Amino acid sequence: MTNMRKTHPLMKIVNNAFIDLPAPSNISSWWNFGSLLGICLILQILTGLFLAMHYTSDTITAFSSVTHICRDVNYGWIIRYMHANGASMFFICLFMHVGRGLYYGSYIFLETWNIGVILLFMTMATAFMGYVLPWGQMSFWGATVITNLLSAIPYIGTNLVEWIWGGFSVDKATLTRFFAFHFILPFIIAAIAMVHLLFLHETGSNNPTGISSDTDKIPFHPYYTIKDTLGALLLILVLMLLVLFAPDLLGDPDNYTPANPLNTPPHIKPEWYFLFAYAILRSIPNKLGGVLALVLSILILVFMPLLHMSKQRSMMFRPISQCLFWILAADLLTLTWIGGQPVEHPYIIIGQLASIMYFLLILVLMPMASTIENNLLKW
């Protein structure tokens, strides 16, 4: 009798994805982040579900309901902080996952890569709307500033903003719809993540060398299940250290002040994981130009396969490209730092230089380095 996991219609799907899946024998810990993202998503959906049971999406009671969750609901404080810091862990894993894809040339799998970029956009949208829900000062003003950017779109901009707001300012209608979208989007993300996996399993995983590993595969279980379990334990360790020892480390103190449309905070800034894009937005003195640069800073990932000039897939054996990749990583850290600083000298010029450097590295320097490396191979 054949094994049930190989014949049962449902178990067969799980088996082919997580048990008998042929995986390259040499994938490193950089390949752990996919499963960690899955864990983050499940964690966010579960904690979010319990928060939604006690949250009220009304401008008058939203802030109080979050306070009530932390003070009066059994273990409400830990659920709330796991959800808030879980988002930070989610984005750390996302950035690592995308960085891995860039370094090892995983973007050559076009469908998988493009669905991944869609997932990134959707996760960013979900996180933004979630940040609005506690209805603190930074929630309100963050929502006002970011939604207002759409008014830069010619002709339809103003109508579009008022349509999203559901009125003439960020108010009850906005909060209610943001809660509705924030609730539904993670389930859509989960569905698209399944499609992401489906396309990945059509081709099989990439590996650090960037060379086909068809001749050297090992079963996913037990080798990578145990490896992913270690990654998951480390993820939970870091998350719980944050939650239990420094729950507000990555938050903004302004969000402990209830939203007040009559009082603007001195420095409006988003959560840390959006600061790099926010810095790029602020570095351009024109509104429409800034919005375009903001969108392009993420959308540029779609063009990575077109910008791939190297004869090798991975950066493993390309020292010049490696150097530029780590300069890009440092540049993103610089932009993240600048995004959290006030708009004054010297931060303005640093932000502008870092923004120029970001696009220059991706669009010009890295393709040039690839071409140079191709020519060096001929020697």
Curated annotation (Swiss-Prot):
Cofactor note: Binds 2 heme b groups non-covalently.
Further comment found in the protein's record: Heme 1 (or BL or b562) is low-potential and absorbs at about 562 nm, and heme 2 (or BH or b566) is high-potential and absorbs at about 566 nm.
Binding site for heme b b562: H83, H182
Subunit structure: The cytochrome bc1 complex contains 11 subunits: 3 respiratory subunits (MT-CYB, CYC1 and UQCRFS1), 2 core proteins (UQCRC1 and UQCRC2) and 6 low-molecular weight proteins (UQCRH/QCR6, UQCRB/QCR7, UQCRQ/QCR8, UQCR10/QCR9, UQCR11/QCR10 and a cleavage product of UQCRFS1). This cytochrome bc1 complex then forms a dimer.
Residues the record lists as binding a ubiquinone: H201
Location(s) in or outside the cell: Mitochondrion inner membrane
Keyword terms, alphabetized: Electron transport, Heme, Iron, Membrane, Metal-binding, Mitochondrion, Mitochondrion inner membrane, Respiratory chain, Transmembrane, Transmembrane helix, Transport, Ubiquinone
Cofactor: heme b
Gene: MT-CYB
GO biological process assignments: mitochondrial electron transport, ubiquinol to cytochrome c
Family: Belongs to the cytochrome b family.
Protein name per Swiss-Prot or TrEMBL: Cytochrome b
GO cellular component entries: mitochondrial inner membrane; respiratory chain complex III
